[in-house]
């Protein structure tokens, strides 16, 4: 009985020390991780609109999204106080899930798409982040249906990923379209 009690106390102490160490490491690394994410996000925005000198956050002005798709950010890209485009970042289900950043011109065309995260099957679903799949969206209207088989050529063997990407794009871009329409077709 005495050995059992001693073992329980020692095990409890190890557990407490491990939890405290984990909490310390988490509190130390969390701000660093957040800074790296913010820096990567800024770099991604700048790569879509390299001429932009500022990005105005408009996430709070967008409508709500139903379903599994989450909007993380939305910005108006500006150059010398002139709107030159917009970006929206959305996450949603594919075969696993994807986070996509989309650039949009002021005449409602897609400039480029960047996958910030794509956790689908390597060599199948991961082809969504490669040409020719990703390139087919360039210069498409944001009012496109993004229907796989009609407007979007699916990746062979990764139809679920293709449909997921198309759904994420359609949902995110419909919010941008509504936003622009509510301002007379302009971003501000």
What positions do the PLM features span?
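Flexible, solvent-exposed loop/hinge segments and secondary-structure transition points
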Residues: 2-188
């Amino acid at each position: 009985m005495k050995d059992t009690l001693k073992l329980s106390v020692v095990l409890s102490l190890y557990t407490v020390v491990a939890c405290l160490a984990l909490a310390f490491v988490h509190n130390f690394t969390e701000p660093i991780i957040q800074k790296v994410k913010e820096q990567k996000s800024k770099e991604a925005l700048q790569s879509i609109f390299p001429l932009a000198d500022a990005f105005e956050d408009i996430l709070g002005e967008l409508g709500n999204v139903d379903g599994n798709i989450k909007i993380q950010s939305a910005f108006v890209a500006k150059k010398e106080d002139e709107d030159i485009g917009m970006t929206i970042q959305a996450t949603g289900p594919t075969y696993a899930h994807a986070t996509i950043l989309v650039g949009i011109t002021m005449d409602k065309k897609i400039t480029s798409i960047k996958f910030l995260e794509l956790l689908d099957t390597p060599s199948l679903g991961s082809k969504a982040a490669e040409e020719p799949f990703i390139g087919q969206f360039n210069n498409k209207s944001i009012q496109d249906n993004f229907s796989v088989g009609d407007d979007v050529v699916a990746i062979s063997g990764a139809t679920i990923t293709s449909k997921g990407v198309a759904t994420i794009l359609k949902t995110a871009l419909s919010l941008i379209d509504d936003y622009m329409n509510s301002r007379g077709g302009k971003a501000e």
